[in-house]
């Protein structure tokens, strides 16, 4: 190969030599390709002819075989974007770069998230490419105070606005002369006075628009800066032309439009300031989450307590937490007992009792006892850090509903410039033939009324505020896509154990004396069965002292048999009692049947071959489960329960909470198939679960909802995480989605409607340029302000909410 390039790809998913051989063979089948795949290093080295192939082709080939190519993700801060055309252009350019798998640019957060192949490109190249487009870019620094940076930028905008307003206000008086035929001092109408005021506004305050326009045009793009620069320049330089005519005596009453250019720039700066101020409020939820983090920790070193910064805590460190202090990091209690306020994580205001070996979560509040703990997760691995990461990703992601606005934004400015040019031609040739000024005014109005900003802000601002508000209530959406999909859900499938129920069996009924209970708990205390644990805990709550068993024997399918202090104990079902010739009184038999019908596990107890008690154990239904399911029904959503339990137990639980559809006796591997069956009926299905065996069903469902108290596998597989396990958050999540999508539609309707109506009105000459500029400035502000209404939304579902 005369013209060759070499690249190295990190491959994931290979398990043996057959994998590496398969990939190597497939790559080498491509023309002019020489590939070697190393299983040990998990790398593929590929030599190829760049005229025939590119790296993406090799990546696609590897992925088609079922393997992955390692991708790195970087977040970039971008400044200088003024409208949707800017963010769309940067996104388009990044996605065309070699080695970039996917790039999204968010105008609201002023950030880009880029997934790239490290063998082909790196973060510095991405930054350089953005800078070449005329914007400032840097790799996001998580330790940098973004709030103070934005506050400084906002202050800078305010100063420029004030200076521009002071210079423009005297010129504004001229507009009142035109509108209301007012008398004003001659100084205000003096061309030199107007020139002196308007020029610094145009070329010092407004220089940013020229710079932005130049950078965009140089790179083959166009944005809002182009519209503002062209529109205000037309007014300003026409005024210069008229002023020259006045100076050389060609006219005694020059038609000046200095006030138009200056007031336009001031109004646009005013709109941008209001927009930036409103946008800064959209990230409040994230700021509140960050403020929850502890700042320092008390570490035990050589027997002494030392306060250290939080970032110096390592896994395995021994920490001491006193009453009223925040738990610094995730960990496990090794000494002491206390109550922990976990409301920031679960929303539950009642403190949770914690003892030795219990886990504690960083940033929760220690209420009343000094504890010693071992750090198990620190830094970015803590529960709060993961919550913040999920919220950040959701707020910077794009919803599919945004695609139309993105497409239009890419063509918006050139179309508007074309309409403005056409307006000028029509006016000067047909409407007012040969008269320059009306044509100029109408075309300037078209240029300045058009607003690509409103289009670009319509979706991301709503997503930011909506996901932030949801996070404040313990609902974590993993992205805008899932916010949009959730509002379409018409069927919710709930796993039973750990989702509808607490997942921990407890004693619900006991008939017998304390001696029988003591013997029963002693017999069960060495068993690892969850039912045995429930019985032992029940006895401990009664403060009974457990002794030791002399003999113990499990009777498969029947129960247990034990000897304790010369007492013979039998615990089990009817069959066990019958086999030992122990008769059941009718009332005991009726109780047993009643418990079993309610889905409880009932056990008979006999001491020395005499029936002495009956105990029932069940996995109890969660608080508010019934209310949550009623709310879902009120919203017009069908609710089903999916469980591996037998039908009787499942029906009993379903009856308690008001679920009509029960899918029972399902093996874990069959859960995903049951979801698919519902989807084949045309239903949009959400699956709610908490265990490892729920993960495939969570992935298969249109929306997977994980209970935050569940396993990491389930949470990773889900699209939404409900913190704390309160089922009332499920209808709230759906309502948050519906409210956010409704808000986005309002924003898009306003953004599209404003431009569709405003541009023709301006072209007809019905709006003065300064009125058009004011309308443009306020259009994007109105979109952001409407999105901010979501901050106050009450997550209370409406009946049959559409």
From Swiss-Prot:
Residues reported to bind Mg(2+): 690, 694
Family annotation (SUPFAM superfamilies): Calcium ATPase, transduction domain A, Calcium ATPase, transmembrane domain M, HAD-like, HMA, heavy metal-associated domain
Subcellular location: Cell membrane
Reactions it catalyzes: Cu(+)(in) + ATP + H2O = Cu(+)(out) + ADP + phosphate + H(+)
GO molecular function, one term: P-type divalent copper transporter activity
Binding of Cu(+) 1, residues: 16, 19
Membrane topology classification: Multi-pass membrane protein
GO biological process terms, semicolon-separated: copper ion homeostasis
Keyword Magnesium tagged: yes
Residues the record marks as active site: 495 (4-aspartylphosphate intermediate)
Stored Pfam families: E1-E2_ATPase, HMA, Hydrolase
Sorted UniProt keywords: ATP-binding, Cell membrane, Copper, Copper transport, Ion transport, Magnesium, Membrane, Metal-binding, Nucleotide-binding, Phosphoprotein, Repeat, Translocase, Transmembrane, Transmembrane helix, Transport
Reported effect, residue 16 to A: Abolishes copper binding
Mutagenesis or variant effect for residue 19 to A: Abolishes copper binding
InterPro entries: ATPase_P-typ_cyto_dom_N (IPR023299), ATPase_P-typ_P_site (IPR018303), ATPase_P-typ_TM_dom_sf (IPR023298), ATPase_P-typ_transduc_dom_A_sf (IPR008250), HAD-like_sf (IPR036412), HAD_sf (IPR023214), Heavy-metal-associated_CS (IPR017969), HMA_Cu_ion-bd (IPR006122)
Induction: Induced by copper and, to some extent, by ferric and lead ions.
GO cellular component, one term: membrane
Residues noted as binding Cu(+) 2 in the record, renumbered to the chain: 83, 86
NCBIfam families assigned to the protein according to its UniProt record, in alphabetical order: ATPase-IB1_Cu, ATPase-IB_hvy, ATPase_P-type, copper ion binding protein
Family of the protein in this entry: Belongs to the cation transport ATPase (P-type) (TC 3.A.3) family. Type IB subfamily.
Function field: Involved in copper export. Can also probably export ferric and lead ions.
Name used for this protein in its record: Copper-exporting P-type ATPase
Organism: Staphylococcus aureus (strain NCTC 8325 / PS 47)
């Amino acid at each position: 190969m005369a013209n060759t390039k070499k690249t190295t790809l990190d491959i994931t998913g290979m398990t043996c030599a057959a994998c590496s051989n398969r990939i190597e063979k497939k790559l080498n089948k491509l023309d002019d390709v020489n590939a070697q795949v190393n299983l040990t290093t998990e790398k593929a080295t590929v030599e190829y002819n760049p005229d025939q192939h590119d790296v993406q082709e090799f990546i696609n080939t590897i992925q088609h075989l079922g393997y992955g190519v390692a991708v790195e993700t970087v977040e970039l801060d971008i400044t200088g974007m003024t409208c949707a055309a800017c963010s769309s252009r940067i996104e388009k350019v990044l996605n065309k770069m070699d080695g970039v798998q996917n790039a999204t640019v968010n105008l609201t957060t002023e950030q880009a998230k880029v997934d790239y192949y490290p063998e082909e490109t790196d973060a510095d190249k991405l930054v350089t490419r953005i800078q070449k487009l005329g914007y400032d870019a840097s790799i996001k620094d998580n330790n940098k105070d973004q709030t103070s940076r934005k506050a400084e930028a906002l202050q800078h905008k305010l100063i420029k606005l004030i200076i521009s307003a002071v210079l423009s206000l005297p010129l504004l008086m001229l507009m009142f002369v035109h509108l209301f035929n007012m008398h004003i001092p001659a100084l205000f109408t003096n061309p030199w006075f107007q020139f002196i005021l308007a020029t610094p506004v145009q070329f010092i305050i407004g220089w940013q628009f020229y710079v932005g326009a130049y950078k965009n045009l140089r790179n083959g793009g166009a944005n809002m800066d182009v519209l503002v620069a062209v529109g205000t320049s037309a007014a300003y330089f026409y005024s210069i032309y008229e002023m020259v005519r006045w100076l050389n005596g060609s006219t005694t009453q020059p038609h000046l439009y200095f006030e138009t250019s200056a007031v336009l720039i001031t109004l646009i700066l005013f709109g941008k300031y209001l927009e930036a101020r409103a946008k800064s409020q959209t990230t409040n939820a994230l700021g509140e989450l960050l403020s929850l983090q502890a700042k320092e920790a008390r570490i035990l070193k050589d027997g002494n307590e030392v306060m250290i910064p939080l970032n110096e805590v390592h896994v395995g460190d021994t920490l001491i937490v006193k009453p009223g202090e925040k738990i610094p990091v995730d960990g496990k209690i090794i000494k002491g007992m206390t109550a922990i306020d976990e409301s920031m994580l679960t929303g539950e205001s009642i403190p949770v009792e914690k003892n030795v070996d219990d886990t504690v979560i960083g940033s929760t509040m220690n209420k009343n006892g000094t504890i010693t703990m071992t750090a198990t997760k620190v830094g970015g691995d803590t529960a709060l850090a993961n919550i913040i990461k999920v919220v950040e990703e959701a707020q910077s992601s794009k919803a599919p509903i945004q695609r139309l606005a993105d497409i239009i934004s890419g063509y918006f400015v050139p179309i508007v410039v074309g309409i403005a040019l056409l307006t000028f031609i029509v006016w000067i040739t047909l409407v007012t033939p040969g008269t320059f000024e009306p044509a100029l005014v109408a075309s300037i109005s078209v240029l300045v009324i058009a607003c690509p900003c409103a289009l670009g802000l319509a979706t991301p601002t709503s997503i930011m505020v909506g996901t932030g508000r949801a996070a404040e209530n313990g609902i974590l959406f993993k992205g805008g896509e899932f916010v949009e999909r959730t509002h379409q859900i018409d069927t919710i499938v709930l796993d039973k154990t750990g989702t509808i129920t607490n997942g921990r069996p407890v004693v619900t009924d006991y008939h017998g004396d304390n001696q029988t209970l003591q013997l029963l708990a002693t017999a069960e205390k060495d068993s690892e069965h969850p039912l045995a644990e429930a019985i032992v805990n029940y006895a401990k709550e009664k403060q009974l002292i457990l002794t030791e068993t002399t003999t113990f024997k499990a009777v498969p399918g029947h129960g247990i048999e034990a000897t304790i202090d010369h007492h013979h104990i039998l615990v089990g079902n009817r069959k066990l009692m019958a086999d030992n010739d122990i008769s059941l009184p009718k009332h005991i038999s009726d109780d047993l049947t009643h418990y079993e019908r309610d889905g409880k596990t009932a056990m008979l107890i006999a001491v020395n071959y005499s029936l002495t008690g009956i105990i029932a154990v069940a996995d109890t239904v969660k608080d508010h489960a019934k209310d949550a399911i009623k709310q879902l029904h009120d919203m017009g959503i069908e609710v089903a329960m999916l469980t591996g339990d037998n039908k009787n137990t499942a029906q009993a639980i379903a009856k308690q909470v008001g679920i009509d559809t029960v899918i029972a006796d399902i093996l874990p591997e069959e859960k995903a198939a049951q979801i698919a069956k519902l989807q084949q009926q045309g239903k949009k299905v959400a699956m709610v679960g908490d265990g490892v065996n729920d993960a495939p069903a969570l992935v298969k469902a249109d929306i997977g909802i994980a209970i935050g108290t569940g396993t990491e596998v389930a949470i990773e597989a889900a699209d939404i995480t409900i913190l704390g396990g309160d089922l009332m958050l499920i209808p709230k999540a759906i309502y948050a989605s519906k409210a956010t999508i409704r808000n986005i539609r309002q924003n898009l309707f306003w953004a599209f409607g404003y431009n569709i109506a405003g541009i023709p009105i301006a072209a007809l000459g019905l709006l003065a340029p300064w009125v058009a500029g004011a309308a443009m400035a306020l259009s994007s502000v109105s979109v952001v302000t409407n999105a901010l209404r979501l901050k106050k939304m009450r997550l209370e579902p409406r009946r049959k909410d559409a």
